[in-house]
Each structure stands twice: as C-alpha cells, then as structure tokens.
Amino acid sequence: MRKKNFIFFIFLIITIEFSTAQISYPGSSLGAAELKNLPGNSVVLENNVIKMKFFNDGKGITIEWFEDKKAHERLKMGNAALFELTFADSSVITSNEFRLLYPPVTSNITPNLHAVTYADRLGGKKYEADFENQKLGLRLHWEADLRDDANYVRQIFTFAAKDTANISKITLVKLPVNIGVVKGGAVDGSPMVHKNMFFAIEHPMGQVEQSKASLVAFLLQLTPVTSDKNLTISTVWGTTPIGQLRRGFLYYIERERSNPYRQMLHYNSWYDISWADRKFNENQALDRIKMFRDSLIIKRQVQLNAFLFDDGWDDNKTLWQFNNTGFPNGFTRLAEVAEACGSSIGVWLSPFGGYNTAKVQRIEFGKNQVPPFETNANGFSLAGPIYYHRFLDVTKNFIKDYNISMFKFDGVGPGNDADGAGVAYHKDIEAFLKLCKDLKQIKPTLYIDLTVGTWASPYWLMYGDNIWRSGGDYGRGGEGSKRQQGITYRDGYTYRNVVKAGPLYPLNALMNGGIIIAEFGLPYKFANDDKDISDDIWSFFGSGVGLQELYINPHYLNTVNWNCLAKASNWAKENERIMPDVHWVGGDPIKSEVYGYAAWSPQRAILMLRNPSNETKSFQVNAANVFELPVNIKNDYRFYDAKTGSKEILAQGQSFTITLQPFEVRVFNALLSE
C-alpha cells in the first residue's frame, strides 16, 4: 500500500470517531449559566436570554414563571406544580402532595469532556431536591439544569417506589391555553409551541391534549414503577430568537441528541446482493467491499464509513445467527478487509422479525423455544423479557466480535406509517428505547439507524441517530423518466411525512431511501442514464441527511457515475459543519413544484434546487428567505456552481430568479459578498 493511502486511511479512522458538527445559535450570545438564591425562598436559573424561577415554601417546589429575556415575555405560572400523576384507579395527585425530604441543593454541573452527547461536555448550574409521598410509597429525585450557552432549561424526574406504584399517566407540562400555545406537529412526541418558545416531554411517545383551560404534555405509563425499576423522564422549557423557532429548536436538539449530527456514508447490500428471501455469502460481500475500496476509497479518495449488510446474512431457523453456508466465519473476514481500508461493518436486524417468508420462519423458530420468544400482532416483541435479552445478546456480540459501527433496526412496534405507538405497542417502544440506550452505553459512537416503526418526533434522536421518513422504500411519483419519478417519490414523501407532519424534526436525521442503482426491486426497471443518475446523486447529497445510503451494485457504475458519486459525496463531507441546519425550500415535489434544501452557517451556505416537472420553471431565490436568515445578518451572497467547483459567480445579490429546465438539479455554494 502506498504511503499516501495509508495516511488517508488513518485520517478516515480519526474522522469517523471524532468529527462533530455543531449548529450556531441564531441570536445574541447566550452566556454562562447562573443560579441565584433570591429573598423569599426563590431560586432563579438564567443566562443572557432565558430565566426560570422556582419557589420553595419549605414543603415543596413550584414554578413561578418562565421568561424570554430578549422578547421581554414572561409566562406567569402561578406557582404551578412540577407534575401531576394519574393512577390506575383514576385518582390524581400533584407534586404539591409530596414533601421535601431535605433542603434543596444548588450546585455546578461538571462537564464531561469525553462525552458524545454535546451538552454533556458543557458545565452549568443545577437546582435539585428529593421528595416523598409516604402514603403512596413514592420518592422523587428532581433537578432543573441550565447548561452554559443553552437556550433551554431541562427538568429531570426520577420516580422510585417502595413497593409498586401503578401510575398510568404522567403530566409534566401544563400551560394556559389562552396564551395561544399549540402542538408543534401532527405526531406523538411533538413539542408545544408558544410564539418563539417551546415546551416538551423529551420522549417520542409524549402526547399533547387540550382542555378548556390548559394544553398539557403527558406520557402514558403502562408499566408499574417498582422497587427495582425506577422511572426517569425529562422535560424542556426553551426559547428562540424571534423568527428563528426551527433553528433555535434545532440548536437545542443538536446539543441533547445521543450523538450530534455526523455523516455515515455507507454501502448497503439491499437491492443488490440482498433481496426478498434470498441469502448471500461472504464472497459476494467481499467483492462489494473490494470494488468500493478500489474505485471509491483508493482511486477517488472518498471516506466510506461502513459496509452495511442487510437482510440475507442469517439463518431464518436460528434467529439472528449466521447461515453457515454463506458465512462459516461470520463477518470476521469482512471486518478485516473493511478495517484495512479505513472503513467498518454495519448490519441489519429486525426487532419484529423482518418480512415475508423469512419472518414466518423466524417466528416459527421463536415459538418453539423453551420458553418461547414473545410476540405481538406485528411479530416479535421486545417488551417480552426472553426475546429482549436474546436480541440484546446478539447485538452486543456483533459489537464485541466484529466492532460493528452501525445497526439498521428495521421494524418495531406499530410498523410503517405510524404517527405514534398507541397503547398496543407502547411497551414495545419503551423496550426498544432501552435497547438503544444499552447499546450506546456499550459503544457510545455506535450509529443506530431507526427505521420502520418510527415517526417524526425529534425525541427519537435521544436514543438513535435517525428515523425513517415512512412510505414505501421506493416508489414513483410525478413526471419524467422512471428514475426521475423515483427521486420525486423519495423527496415527496419526506415533504409530506416529515416537513408537514413534524415541522421541528431535523431533516438532517432521516433515512430517506438513499441512492439505488442495483439489480432488484422497482429501481431495476430504471434506465441507468448518466444524467438521471447524476440528478439522483446530487439531489440526495444536497438533502443534507447524515445517513448516506448507497444501495449500489458497483459493477453497474461507469467512470462518469463513479466521478459524480465521488464529487457529490466529498462536497457533502466538505460541508458537514453546515449540513445540520438543512431545511426545506419550495413546494411539494409530487405536485411538480420546484423544491430543494438549504443550510446556513455564519461562514457560508448551500442550496439545492430541483424542478420535478417536464416544463421549464422559474424560482425566486431570496437569500433571506431560503436561508431563513436571522435578523441583522447580511443577505448579499455570491452563488457558485457546486457541481463543477467553478469560481465563476453564477448569481450575486440579495435576490435573483433562476430558470430550471425540466428535471434539472442545481446545487450552489453561497458566500457573503465582500
């Protein structure tokens, strides 16, 4: 191996583990957290933009008010209770019926500089207390945290029972409806929004309901709190600059998600050597690794993070064990070859058992075990302790034996096109979240691709790295060639299922279907036209998603395709620190409206536009609008062609009109004019 390639591989390994992108706060400096003890037994957590006041009457703690210091708006809470518990017998109590065990404590938060969750690397201030309700045999540890440079206060509640507490519902945020507070999305786990403020239970199954007087955020609790099983849940109260709700909320999410935004460029075997119920083998997998190694990693110096092997590696009659004919040594050889070129191995697993005949066989095997693996209407159930521990053991062994860098978890709980778990799959999703936390504790840098069974709640990102956009894996929509219709379908369902249903969900954290150039499924019928493939590649990388899926048979690509793939993926990598801000621009692809993605940072911006129709169309690019610029930010930009990398200025100014030919994809780098 040549020296420069060896150095390049070392660079890849370092970058894979430690690259972190962070979004800029779109307002004035937030500043260090402060905690003040005020006369009258009150405590205030604050910084330059946010302020929250708690009152201690010697028996308990209540919320007095929450303030946006920049907008000069204070929500007076009237000494509101910290929480409300509903029990199985329909009785209701609030935190006012708990008593302080000891005087509350104020303290500094010690930063963990090695944490993968960005907020954990920061210091701050904490106000905490312990409560008890002797009659119920319940204790609570509560804390309110404000980290340095945060635009939000988090409250963490940990309930512990002396024996068993049959709590059925926990209400943690209760706001007066007359202030105009609304639910900020159509799915469970959406935050509540009041002007430029946001409030939420940090859980994908959190729900919002309205009464005559209040809008409340609550979580159903279907599993009793017991002496050996505590319940921890958290809330957030935050604020954003006026006109910057999406970006201000994103700033919070990027700090608190399990891992900040990162790009995971990888080959996926589905549509290629994996398909339906067929099995593949080590030689086929090694061929794909070596082809990508030679054509992309070495020849074109592209960082390929992983090779993920989808359904087809296992023996259906063993449940998540290798088929010995295809993989007599498991993934040992694959891992060795992948790691030698600076990459890694990923693997597909389906919590509920997969699909079609393979699923039937796996479930039949599970039923015949002693004791049998638990199931629900959709397949295996992680809520069952027998199956949970089997699934956990399998995933732990993949990490231990093959240093797996990513899991694709395909199929859990309610399945595809869900907007929440419902009562039927609530326990299954709780178990799934626990599984993700268990795995992240074993390997904090692990990438977890959460697919079928998720919905557009940002709080999935507290546990994994992305969700599925919902809809079909692939389809056709709109006009043009079959591949152009495939692009329109992919992006159209992102628009309908995420942009519209979960407007505060980060578009950077989606599995949207990737690039498919392979042998099986609907994409096999797509003509491999170089122009269409280029449009597919650039529109995909222009979407800014961190999960960069290449469902590609490398033998199908010609030199033009390889060069395009290399240029587009490297362009995305060069803009990794901008991509977290990616947001929607334009209209509905399926209605043949011009659309695209944009992302902004104080240093530079990017813009991708596509015309999904067979007619020439014009689009007005107003920099302030497409980049959603904060107030008092310059909006005079120079636009350059990202595809060619040319230094020729294509457009300049605050606004310009662009003409897009039928099915044209344009990608711009934008720099402030000097």
Q: Whereabouts are the PLM-identified features?
A:
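Active-site groove signature of glycoside hydrolases
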Residues: 302-313, 392-422
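Aromatic- and acidic-residue-enriched segments that line the glycan-binding/catalytic groove
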Residues: 319-327, 353-375, 462-473
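Active-site-adjacent "subsite" loops/lids of carbohydrate-active enzymes
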Residues: 271, 275-277, 344-402
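Acidic-aromatic substrate-binding/catalytic surfaces of carbohydrate-active enzymes
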Residues: 40-130
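Active-site-proximal substrate-binding groove within the catalytic cores of carbohydrate-active enzymes
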Residues: 47-48, 66, 228-230, 268, ...
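Solvent-exposed beta-strand/loop surfaces of large extracellular or lumenal domains
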Residues: 203-213, 633-655
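Conserved structural scaffold segments of CAZyme catalytic domains across common CAZy folds
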Residues: 105-346, 350-360, 547-590, 599-605, ...
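Bacterial Sec-dependent N-terminal signal peptides
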Residues: 1-26
